[in-house]
Amino acid sequence: MNALPPAIFLMGPTAAGKTDLAIELSKVLPCELISVDSALVYRGMDIGTAKPSKAQLAEYPHRLIDILDPAQSYSAADFRSDALAAMAEITARGNIPLLVGGTMLYFKALLHGLADMPAADAQVRAQLEADAQAYGWQSLHDQLAVVDPVSAARIHPNDPQRLIRALEVYRVSGMSMTAHREQQTAQSTEAAASGRQQLPYTVANLAIAPADRKVLHQRIALRFEQMLDQGFLDEVLALRSRGDLHSGLPSIRAVGYRQVWDHLDGKLTRDEMQERGIIATRQLAKRQFTWLRSWEDLHWLDSLASDNLSRALKYLGSVSILS
């Protein structure tokens, strides 16, 4: 019997069928589901994220879905903290945490840990907010561009939360947020290479995807078309009508949302929006495969197989997760 409690990772590219398999597993195992998806954390973003339906979530609850407003930011460190808390609660009930999703950075952060970012400093933050009031947010963004051009390129001038945090990190530590993240990545990669795990669980790693990449591309295109038929444009229109969201926010930069937003801005025709949305989703899947190829002890399942549940259960039994 393992000294550490069990956990299951169910990973894979977008449109591979992860959610359906996770639900099937939860029907026959003492599992509770935790979402590992950087877009599903946002409320009001249902169609474009292929979020499980309200009926599915009512019957098979997922932790870490609909926990944030789209105006907020969410980091890998935030996820790790939230996921560890959820896993501890699930384990305390005698159940198995089943983490399902495609945000591979989150899985890696959970498994191998992250170096700590500098803590918030109230005095520094107050000074930055005062500067913003006096000189405007663009002035702070210009400051960030000097000390951390990489962060400045990805943070919109109208995203005060992330802008202040990036400048705060630099002023408190003397290192840019980009440098800290590079350090985190290096330490996490070193931990992975050496087999050092920072997660107090015995983890079984499952991945699901079509064996033929062309099939995945077809599924991605079909799903994007279905999203449009289901009212994806209306969903983004509702987000725009709030007046406090913009294209620089992490939520709006999510695959699909960015392209629809640009279409509604008049930058893309509908056909261009659809084509670019599908291409962006395929590029996301390619990045996910790149992460998965380097993942150790990964058991693959074919999305098109009819017996994935029994195959998954057989594997979980073979690695003593179910003992």
UniProtKB/Swiss-Prot annotation:
Annotated residues for binding of ATP: G12, P13, T14, A15, A16, G17, K18, T19
Disulfide bonds: none
Catalytic activity entry: adenosine(37) in tRNA + dimethylallyl diphosphate = N(6)-dimethylallyladenosine(37) in tRNA + diphosphate
Swiss-Prot/TrEMBL keywords: ATP-binding, Magnesium, Nucleotide-binding, Transferase, tRNA processing
Pfam families linked: IPPT
Entry's Gene Ontology BP terms: tRNA modification
Function recorded in the entry: Catalyzes the transfer of a dimethylallyl group onto the adenine at position 37 in tRNAs that read codons beginning with uridine, leading to the formation of N6-(dimethylallyl)adenosine (i(6)A).
Homology family: Belongs to the IPP transferase family.
Quaternary structure note: Monomer.
HAMAP family named in the record: IPP_trans
The protein's name in its UniProt record: tRNA dimethylallyltransferase
